[in-house]
């Protein structure tokens, strides 16, 4: 199958909501070695976000059930074994994506926005790994995630408008990383607030093409800020991860 056929198959898979097939097609496109177009980049991102998202959601549900079965050894063992199965799937998906990023996507990225997009993706998938890791493995995945986010953040600050949806999406996910993974609410709030304020100050630079994406992410930043501020003030609330 040539590149255009693989891309067509990925689009078909997306319409059928068969995201594993979509990811397989876009992985094959990436392994051809050429730099991806914006459309191809987005197809790859959507495919893997759905594939890993389903496992993250399952993992959370099963972990919660596992905790509730304390005192019932047989049920707890069944829940634990099932959680470990989902965990292995999740880890394999993340390692697949990180391998594509390290071998093809980051080295081949020429425009700054592509570099930021892929480094953000690298931060995201190490973050997903860290959610299910423990001990030394957790420390390593957390450090790798932070390093990728930080590198992307520095490029985005110097090369992109504050209203650019990729820069805003990075700020959103990096702030979630500080809040959820590093347990640093002050740093999370500070990062989210700066990104929001800087974008508001330059709203006139928004082009029609990205207006919808940018304003949606700004809304998510504001929602998280409201939530995190109320939580740090001692109010009970569930964290809606506005994860881009």
Swiss-Prot record:
Organism: Xenopus laevis
Site (Interaction with phosphoserine on interacting protein) residue list: 56, 127
Localization per record: Cytoplasm
Main location: cytoplasm
Keywords associated with the record: Acetylation, Cytoplasm
InterPro entries from the UniProt entry: 14-3-3, 14-3-3_CS, 14-3-3_dom_sf, 14-3-3_domain
Function: Adapter protein implicated in the regulation of a large spectrum of both general and specialized signaling pathways. Binds to a large number of partners, usually by recognition of a phosphoserine or phosphothreonine motif. Binding generally results in the modulation of the activity of the binding partner.
UniProt KW Repressor keyword: no
SUPFAM superfamilies the record matches: 14-3-3 protein
Assembly with partners or alone: Homodimer, and heterodimer with other family members.
Modified residues annotated as N-acetylmethionine in this record: 1
GO BP: protein localization; signal transduction
PANTHER family tied to this protein: 14-3-3 PROTEIN (PTHR18860)
Gene Ontology cellular component annotations, sorted alphabetically: cytoplasm
Domain of life (superkingdom): Eukaryota
Entry protein name: 14-3-3 protein beta/alpha-B
Pfam families with a match to the protein in the record: 14-3-3 (PF00244)
Family according to the record: Belongs to the 14-3-3 family.
UniProt keyword Hydrolase, yes or no: no
